[in-house]
């Protein structure tokens, strides 16, 4: 038998007690626990997003309760801090989905969030790895419970976004009382889908003065919509508020409306502040045809990673679909882009004198002429000032609308 000295017995006993102590265990876990660094809420009529940013990946589980409706999210190996304590103050009174949020330390190692709901919801809870300027993120998306199964956003959640989506815009056309432009032989008014880039969690490019691309392009898109509707066209937008819409859903929204034209509007940045000018891009599935186009292709296609898309969702339209009627669509996209570029060239210096090409995910529609407009560079001091001007934004919108009108008159209406 091994004999222990009195000092050895005391040391072993103390070590065992400390190891078994709940307090000691909690303290040990506290040291390793991720720290919450930011919390954001993005309310919209499409869906509301809650984002928790942390220093390390979070383990979580969630469930719902009824009467009243609540979503409960338990975050393991975590400790409440000032970020979570301030979460309730971030809830907006006009949030369509969230009534209030409570956060507390449910157990020594578990933080519990209780989200009081205003209506029945479909909740998506998922984690995102670090990307761009973001750390690890835990995302809670709340969608209306009765969302139409054919809605492109619901198709993304169900993993069926790659199915060919065809909407029935006839009901919308019947309700539109704007003046009637010329019609094709089938009597259908031209349909235009405008796509303001980025939104919500994804700010897009940010100028040295703090101007965010997502706000600039939404302003331009709204004015473009007004200009086109004044001409009598049927105009829709992929987003009309500060909300993140995945790239594939943007394409699907246009296809669901059977859009004759899809215009994605941006105001990007480049590594050098000297880069300037307006540009128009069309799809090239083989990749970019210039170094600038390659840079923009990478930044724009990264939007889903920055904005946050559940990994179970199909992010983009299936590339197999691109074989369908692709030649005619690309030809029409080039014609549309050329006409819009000509109009924009009267307003601002052109980055290139021709339509550039890149493999932009948001342009991957097999049957919808699509272009991406870079209105100007937020990274250029002079153009940052222009983009901050309401007058320049309005002129951008007018130029885009004029180019679209020329395309519709020479292509869409002629073929009926």
Swiss-Prot record:
Extra facts: Present in outer membrane vesicle formulations which are used as vaccines in human.
Record InterPro entries: AMIN_dom (IPR021731), MurNAc-LAA_cat (IPR002508), N-acetylmuramoyl_amidase_3 (IPR050695)
Gene name, Swiss-Prot/TrEMBL: amiC
S-S bonds: none
EC number: 3.5.1.28
Signal peptide: 1-26
Pfam families referenced in this protein's UniProt entry, alphabetically: Amidase_3, AMIN
Domain of life from the UniProt record: Bacteria
MurNAc-LAA domain segment(s): 192-405
Localization in the cell: Periplasm
Catalyzed reactions per annotation: Hydrolyzes the link between N-acetylmuramoyl residues and L-amino acid residues in certain cell-wall glycopeptides
Principal location: periplasm
MF terms in GO: N-acetylmuramoyl-L-alanine amidase activity
GO biological process, any: FtsZ-dependent cytokinesis
Gene Ontology, cellular component aspect: outer membrane-bounded periplasmic space
Family: Belongs to the N-acetylmuramoyl-L-alanine amidase 3 family.
Function: Cell-wall hydrolase involved in septum cleavage during cell division.
Enzyme class, first EC level, given as a word: hydrolase
Name recorded for this polypeptide: N-acetylmuramoyl-L-alanine amidase AmiC
